[in-house]
Amino acid sequence: MRGGGFVQIFKDFSNWSTVAVVPHVANANNKISRIFWIAIFLFVLGMFAYELYILIAKFFSYPATVNTEILFEKQIFPVVTVCNMNPYKYSVVKSNSAFSSVNTLMTTYSDATVGTFSTDKWGLYADNDETYDLDSRAADALVLEANLISDTAKVPALYTYADLIQDCSFAGIPCSESDFTKFIDPVYGACYSFNEDASLNYSVSREGIQFGLKLMLTVTQTKTNGNTDSLPTTKLAGARIGVNSRGSSPGLDSNGIDAGVGYESAVSVSLTQNVRAKKPYGTCVDREPDSSDYYKDFIYTLETCFNGCKQRDTIAKCQCANPRLALGSTDTACQPIKADLDCLQTLKGNQTSSTPNIDLLVECNCNPPCDESTYTPTVSLAQFPSTSYYVATSSTAGVGSCSSTNSKFSSKSDCQKWYNNNGMIIQVFLETLSYELYTETAGYTVSNVINDLGGQAGLWLGLSVISVVEMTGLMLVMGAFCVTGGAIKMAPDDDEIENDHRIKDVEDVKKEIDHLEKKHGEMESGSDGEVDDIENKGDEEKKKK
């Protein structure tokens, strides 16, 4: 009985279902027609299953899309960091006992460059036939030697704000030392960051060079008396410039801009913001795990992650940390000895050999930050000062203006020449107030799946919301039938049909109708006979006459 009940349920469903093909299968007149419609149903069902698989696979691949917006609004001015490429005053290095090892290094390097061969603890003479190798090793040795000197002991040899920055203005308004944050870089010595302090509120609502930061710098490779004050290992005369968002690492050693003496360097910057999607739609992270984060004081960037990875690689291979990069609280810095310098040199790798440098993209497992602001610089140069321009500055603590009252120079032309060899102007400004915002979002959501699923179901099976309701009703009826154990009858049995008064009433009505039709037929037959008798009688009377 239960099997028959299910059959009856499906028969009823096929009669009123809106699902494509199902009514055709149920109401087919012959076997061939039914087989044909079953084949059609299986085909469209298979196509729907294939499309469903594609939709599910696409959803679980978690694709992402990038929305691009061009925004135009008032912007916070970026942090601008300036450092002297010459980290320490050579005059102090030669006279201050705290720098005795650095002074010995400078003397040894100078001897090596002119071919005076001897032995040394840094290995400057060993296997350094190329000038580049000698310069690179001497620069690394200087960083290691300076790392052994405390920040307090370094102060006499560092360039003060007054030594480095002769003049400062922002949008034409003078700025001062209080607008800068000082820090000591392991490579460039004392550096000064403008607008780094969160209490400052330098922002711009107009673009162009007139509404940016203007600095006059003096790197003092020679003093005003003509004595050289630049270390022998300093190759370039100028400043290292960094432009970054507040809270980010300046990245001077890898991402800085070189600005040379005797020029005005105009640095126009444009802002780009990236908002990336987190897992599963993206790979961005907010921070590294604390156990491996060397740059906890800075906003996370790919650069900080790569630097931390390089530091871990250095510690693993050299058993010491490179002072050029951030050190952990328990790390031991490499010593200024040949063995450690040799190890650091090997980590740089020979990119043309089978032992290249560490592959940061493969070996470091660094992911981009979820929220990132970057400034793209464009630099243009012009000679400074011009042949007829005599430098004027409001500063009285530094070298001062090229005026006749300046006792540091014998003439205005000598002052001009000194600035040409030691001075420079830096101008940093926003190229435009518009900036690009890239927002990464989920590219295929549940809503998209439902929309596409509805389209495919309608195309291949003719399904709609009504069809879903019908199939839901079918499931409920089948469930109720199973729960009641077949007690719910899907069709009446023979006894119920025989005793159903409604059916009997219908049969009685049918019999009565048949009887009336028979009587009506007999009456019509009788009427035709009477008409014939009347016609015959009329004919006989005519004959008699």
Curated annotation (Swiss-Prot):
Known catalytic reactions: Na(+)(in) = Na(+)(out)
Cytoplasmic side: 1-34, 479-545
GO biological process: sodium ion transmembrane transport
Activity control, per UniProt: Inhibited by the diuretic drug amiloride.
Disulphide-bonded residues: 83-191, 284-370, 305-366, 309-364, 318-343, 320-334
Membrane topology: Multi-pass membrane protein
Positions glycosylated per UniProt: 201, 350
All ranges on the Extracellular side of the membrane: 56-457
Region Disordered, annotated ranges: 514-545
Chain's role: Could form pH-gated heterotrimeric sodium channels that act as postsynaptic excitatory sensors in the nervous system, generating rapid, transient inward currents that fully desensitize upon extracellular acidification.
Protein's name according to its UniProt entry: Degenerin-like protein asic-2
Provenance organism: Caenorhabditis elegans
